[in-house]
UniProtKB/Swiss-Prot annotation:
UniProt keyword Transcription regulation, yes or no: no
A single GO cellular-component term on record: small ribosomal subunit
Assigned protein family: Belongs to the universal ribosomal protein uS19 family.
Function: Protein S19 forms a complex with S13 that binds strongly to the 16S ribosomal RNA.
GO molecular function, one term: rRNA binding
InterPro entries: Ribosomal_uS19 (IPR002222), Ribosomal_uS19_bac-type (IPR005732), Ribosomal_uS19_CS (IPR020934), Ribosomal_uS19_SF (IPR023575)
Protein name: Small ribosomal subunit protein uS19
A GO biological-process term: translation
Organism the protein comes from: Pseudomonas fluorescens (strain Pf0-1)
Length: 91
């Protein structure tokens, strides 16, 4: 269920400050964050944000199509390796 337009997008303040500083300095280093719940804003386009997936930080290069989505959508937390093959079918 999307957030109400009356409330506006949610973004953690500490992440917003880091983004403003990086944009001001034209810094190309990834911004490390644990805030998967923050929404991607137009100010983030072109920046690389390292989003934590529970084990490591996954670098996410933000483009215009990602605006409006959450950061956590682009850093998967589960590792699916497929089902084990049935040994009876091989015989």
């Amino acid at each position: 269920m999307p957030r109400s337009l009356k409330k506006g997008p949610f973004i953690d303040l500490h992440l917003l400050k880091k983004i403003e500083v990086a944009a001001e300095k034209n810094d190309r280093k990834p911004i490390k964050t644990w805030s998967r719940r923050s929404m991607i804003l137009p100010q983030m386009v072109g920046l690389t944000i390292a989003v934590h997936n529970g084990r490591q930080h996954v670098p996410v290069l933000v483009n215009e199509d990602m605006v409006g989505h959450k950061l956590g959508e682009f850093a998967g937390t589960r590792n699916y390796r497929g089902h084990v093959a049935d040994k009876k079918a091989k015989r």
